[in-house]
Design a protein with these regions (language model features):
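Juxtamembrane boundary at the C-terminal end of a transmembrane helix
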Residues: 147-151
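Juxtamembrane/interface alpha-helical elements of multi-pass membrane proteins
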Residues: 1-60
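A structural signal for well-ordered alpha-helices, especially hydrophobic packing surfaces
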Residues: 23, 48, 56, 60-63, ...
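Membrane-protein extramembrane domains
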Residues: 58-82
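Canonical alpha-helical transmembrane segments of integral membrane proteins
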Residues: 140-146
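Short, non-transmembrane cytosolic segments of multipass membrane proteins
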Residues: 73-104
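Membrane-interface, cytosolic juxtamembrane amphipathic helix immediately N-terminal to a transmembrane helix
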Residues: 7, 97-140
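Residue-level recognition of alpha-helical structural elements
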Residues: 8-11, 33, 48, 64-67, ...
């Protein structure tokens, strides 16, 4: 349970980094989304690079697919690839509307998504800390019970 929570927090950290990176690439470099995803994937570990490479490849093919469709399809099943749950993935999937927005609106949406991911991460970190205390107390109590039984 605790390890799963730690894995979710790690994945959220990666997602937050991704959206910070996207913010700087789109805001300062004025890069296209396919280029942003390729650059981000080259700098990341875990399940994210696979997803981002697939999105970038499909965007570069320019076969008439809608960005929203590509983004939604590639993030479907991401729970298996990187341990994220529906709550985080639904926030990430909201980025799918980006294909139709200008740079300013993209940056605003990216910032909003990043902030929501940070809120989820902060909540999970507090939960992890609280559960850590509970596990410590339960461990100490079970140790005392065993020692009393043996005495």
């Amino acid at each position: 349970m605790r390890e799963r929570l730690k894995a979710r927090i790690r994945c959220l950290g990666q997602a937050i980094w991704l959206f910070r990176f996207m913010e700087s690439e789109i805001g300062y470099q004025k890069s296209e989304l396919a280029v942003v995803f390729e650059r981000a994937a080259d700098r990341m570990e875990g399940g994210f690079p696979k997803i981002l490479h697939r999105v970038a490849k499909r965007l570069q093919l320019r076969n008439g697919e809608d960005f929203k469709k590509i983004w939604q399809e590639e993030w479907t099943g991401a729970e298996k690839e990187n341990g994220m749950l529906g709550e985080e993935l639904s926030v990430i999937r909201e980025f799918a509307t980006q294909g139709y927005q200008d740079v300013h609106m993209q940056l605003m949406q990216i910032q909003m998504i990043r902030e929501r991911l940070e809120q989820i991460k902060n909540r999970l970190e507090a939960e992890l800390q609280q559960k850590g205390r509970i596990y410590l107390c339960v461990g100490m109590l079970s140790g005392m019970v065993v020692s009393i039984i043996l005495i």
